[in-house]
């Protein structure tokens, strides 16, 4: 079994120190925040993946509100329980029809033993991304975020995330958005 270096308090500090040495803009941000920056993390497995799908192309506040309402409907937050909820309830909670279809499809794949999210923990990053993006509703952003937030992989980064691109633009004082 491959052993991966995972995000924890020690590796977060190492990463901050590395960034502060390499990039003055990061150093300034880290010092302004007194290095008190919480990592982006989610629960591993079904709940984390569904949370990321809800977040696709939404503001953080909107996504959190919708997912909070979904968690009231789905107790416990399992694929089986998810599938037992009338899809109209998810629509009332603010989830789009398309995302309801994506989430239901993922839940069904898990219930039918066609998707094993636990097995992803032991796979290389590229393999995890490859397997996830084969699933309807999951693109590179979601797969990269799953690696970073749910599996806590250190070298995962959702490079196409508009919020991160704009933050880098501001930090570097760039006129134009950087490309990836």
Where are these regions (language model features)?
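Intrinsically disordered, low-complexity, charged terminal extensions of DNA damage-control enzymes
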Residues: 1-41
